[in-house]
């Protein structure tokens, strides 16, 4: 009887060890760790089509780029962007990991748990449309690519680009109209990126201050 009990105990230990090895997979390397980030504003032509617009590349576009780095993901000291009233810009996020490899497509690949919000501008001074699409041409509303239109003059303000890593199931409650929702924290999750830069909305050609 004693030998039988020993055998049963040994088998139980083996079964428990096998179960644990199946239940505890090796953690994946986090592909969303960001070392640097850039926001690139490229002037485009906005072509209105009723309730939506097409955005077309133009020759010799104005391009404005700001890079964020360091532990706090800050722009260069004194960085100050000018965007011109009446113009539309393709706003692109380019993110790299700590090895310098681009990682922004990770956010698009996980579109069900990511969405960007663009905050800080005076009311009605900007409008924005998400531009991310999947392989089938379906809109994803992530914000790695989008289109920003400057509607009105505005004194300098702090533009805040927040890329939210949402809890499961939350994205279904968010619409494209929430792009500048100051209460974005109601959409539970954590921020993968929280980028801030000084922006001034100016008349065409007025870049003197």
What are these regions (language model features)?
Residues 3-4, 13-42, 209:
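Bacterial Sec-dependent N-terminal signal peptides
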Residues 21-28, 45, 97-106:
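Short amphipathic, basic-aromatic surface patches that mediate peripheral association
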Residues 28, 101-153:
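Extended, polar beta-sheet/loop recognition surfaces of beta-rich domains
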Residues 28-29, 78-85, 150-151:
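Short, solvent-exposed beta-strand/turn "edge" segments of beta-rich domains on protein surfaces
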Residues 34, 39-41, 45, 52-56, ...:
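A composition-driven surface/loop motif
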Residues 89-95, 153-181:
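Internal, hydrophobic beta-strand segments that form the core of beta-sheet-rich folds
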Residues 174-209:
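Short beta-strand elements
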């Amino acid at each position: 009887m004693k030998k039988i009990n020993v055998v049963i105990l040994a088998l139980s230990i083996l079964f428990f060890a096998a179960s644990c090895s199946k239940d505890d997979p090796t953690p994946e390397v986090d592909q969303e760790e960001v070392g640097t980030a850039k926001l690139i504003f490229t002037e485009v032509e906005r072509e209105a089509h009723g309730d939506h617009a097409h955005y077309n590349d133009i020759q010799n576009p104005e391009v404005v780029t700001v890079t964020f780095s360091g532990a706090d993901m800050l722009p260069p000291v004194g960085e100050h962007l000018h965007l011109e009233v009446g113009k539309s810009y393709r706003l692109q996020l380019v993110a790299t990991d700590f090895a310098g490899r681009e990682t922004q497509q990770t956010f698009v690949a996980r579109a069900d748990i990511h969405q960007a919000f663009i905050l800080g501008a005076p009311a009605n001074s900007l409008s924005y449309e998400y531009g991310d699409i999947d392989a089938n041409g379906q809109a994803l509303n992530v914000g790695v690519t989008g289109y920003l239109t400057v509607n009105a003059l505005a004194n300098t303000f702090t533009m805040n680009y927040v890329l939210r890593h949402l809890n499961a199931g939350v994205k279904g409650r968010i619409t494209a109209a929430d792009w500048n929702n100051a209460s974005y924290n109601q959409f539970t999750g954590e921020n993968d990126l929280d980028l801030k830069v000084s922006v001034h909305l100016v008349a065409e050609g007025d870049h003197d201050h």
